[in-house]
UniProtKB/Swiss-Prot annotation:
Gene: gltX
Catalytic activity: tRNA(Glu) + L-glutamate + ATP = L-glutamyl-tRNA(Glu) + AMP + diphosphate
Entry similarity comment: Belongs to the class-I aminoacyl-tRNA synthetase family. Glutamate--tRNA ligase type 1 subfamily.
Motif ('HIGH' region): 11-21
The name this protein goes by in its record: Glutamate--tRNA ligase
Species this protein is from: Bacillus anthracis
């Protein structure tokens, strides 16, 4: 009988949930759910100096926001816990002591200064820097001497000589490494904390992980983990290394690149929809059959096939994400769009935190004008700017429109119509524009464009009668007067 699929997402709490980490989690989630397997969250927090406050909470909170759930983990428990590495130190100790006893690992007393000098010498000689094995076979007398000096050892894994390590990668097909390319690597640091490669191999085995799907940057760790599996006589899981995510310059996405929004929390704050972010990330390095790009989470689960993970780097296209979020925004009811928009209008000082019923109705109608156009909640601030300014600036194209010979006549006639209106309603505005057409004989662009530009400052925008109605009589007349002079 085939083993049940068990995969894990194992972040370090060294920062908030990044788009790259979210993709790793999402592909593991889809892989597990597609095969009725188990999805596990494990926190790899042994690099205590790099852990940040709130890092773990951010990971879990925003995975949930994206719509993912998990079967085992730090917050839900499970039979293979604990799921936080700093709570598993006794487990690691027992196992690395076993390696020491069997001579498969040894204590290394070299200082950082000695190791650095060794590295510099290798580089100067044109060699690849790696540990040369100086303390591989220390005598008892040497060990006693180092300990008398107060040196604290690390523990290194004894890498087998002249061995090929080959594995069939789910994404890359066959990958091969040679053991002679590796020095004996540290499995326990001087502070007694296991290194990444040792802890990961132990955890993946003890948690019965069947498939390890992770980023391309981990591929050089794989042979080291295979050596540890082999040393204990454990079955090796299947590995899959997903290609890097690159920016539009085809360079690896860097967390330091502030020109691209890269953290899930930021997208939530900007008023993006979790379903759209999920959809976008699911297509970063994976492609479905056909041309369709908009899918629900359930559809992704049903069709996810790891064989369709791309071998080429995944392009992070910010404009495509905006387009995709807009597709989802269009499907939302107005209440949801209002909820996503209001905090940004408050933050920009456009509206107060507390609104009267009349103000609530007005701002709701303003947001409704842009429902189909909005890419994300925060965009409402820029889109609706004309409703919150006394005067408008005219675009270059708009300035050309206002130079037309018919403009003063059209605007004077329209101002007269607006002045006479009892209520600024879209239907009444529409009727007023028709009356101007009848009065002046101007129609089409010669009629509509001067009115649009003079009242809104724009040559394109929402339905004109609706926009003018929401601007209110005073603003509209002031703007018309400014152009008429």
């Amino acid at each position: 009988m085939e083993k049940q699929v068990r995969v894990r997402y194992a972040p370090s709490p060294t920062g908030h949930l990044h788009i790259g980490n979210a993709r790793t989690a999402l592909f593991n989630y889809l892989f597990a759910r597609h095969q009725d397997g188990k999805f596990i969250i494990r926190i790899e927090d042994t690099d205590v100096k790099r852990n940040v406050a709130g890092g773990e909470e951010s990971q879990l909170k925003y995975l949930k926001w994206l719509g993912m759930d998990w079967d085992e983990g730090v917050d839900v428990g499970g039979e293979f816990g604990p799921y936080r590495q700093t709570e598993r130190l006794d487990i690691y100790k027992k196992l690395y002591e076993d390696l020491l006893e069997r001579g498969l690992a040894y204590k290394c007393y070299m200082t950082e200064e000695e190791l650095e000098a060794e590295r510099e010498g290798q580089i100067a000689r044109g060699e690849t820097p790696r540990y040369a094995g100086n303390h591989r076979d220390l005598t008892e007398a040497q060990v006693k001497e180092f300990e008398a000096e107060g040196r604290i050892p690390s523990i290194r894994f004894r890498v087998p000589a002249d061995r090929d390590y080959t594995f069939k990668d789910i994404v890359k097909d066959e990958v091969a490494f040679h053991s002679n390319d590796f020095g004996d690597f540290v499995i326990v640091k001087k502070d007694g904390i296991p290194t990444y490669n040792f802890a990961v191999a132990v955890d993946d085995h003890l948690m019965e992980i069947t498939h390890v799907l992770r980023g391309d940057d981990h591929i050089s760790n794989t042979p080291k983990q295979m050596m540890i599996y082999e040393a204990f006589g454990w079955d090796i899981p299947q590995f899959g290394h997903m290609t890097l995510i690159v920016n539009e310059s085809r360079k690896k996405l860097s967390k330091r690149d502030e020109s691209i929004i890269q953290f899930i929390e930021q997208y939530k704050e900007l008023g993006y929809l979790p379903e759209a972010i999920f959809n976008f990330i699911a297509l970063l390095g994976w492609s479905p059959v056909g041309e369709e790009e908009i899918f629900s989470q359930e559809e992704f689960i049903k069709m996810f096939d790891a064989a369709r993970l791309s071998k080429s780097p995944a392009l992070f296209d910010s404009q495509k994400l905006k387009w995709m979020n807009n597709q989802y925004m269009k499907k939302q009811d107005l209440d949801t769009v209002v909820e996503l928009s209001l905090p940004h209008l408050v933050k920009a000082g456009r509206i107060g935190e507390t609104l009267s019923e009349q103000e609530q109705a007005w701002i709701r109608d303003v947001i409704a004008l842009y429902h189909e156009q909005m890419s994300f909640g925060a965009e409402i601030v820029e889109l609706s700017e004309m409703f919150f300014k006394d005067h408008v600036d005219y675009e270059e194209e708009g300035q050309e429109v206002l130079k037309g010979e018919q403009v003063p006549e059209v605007l004077r006639a329209f101002a007269g119509q607006v002045e006479a209106l009892e209520a600024m309603e879209p239907a009444a505005i529409k009727a007023a524009i028709k009356a101007v057409q009848k009065e002046t004989g101007h129609k089409g662009k010669n009629l509509f464009m001067p009115i649009r530009v003079a009242t809104t400052g724009q040559t394109h925008g929402p339905e004109l009668p609706n926009a003018i109605a929401l601007l209110g009589k005073e603003k509209v007349l002031n703007r018309l007067q400014k152009v008429i002079g």
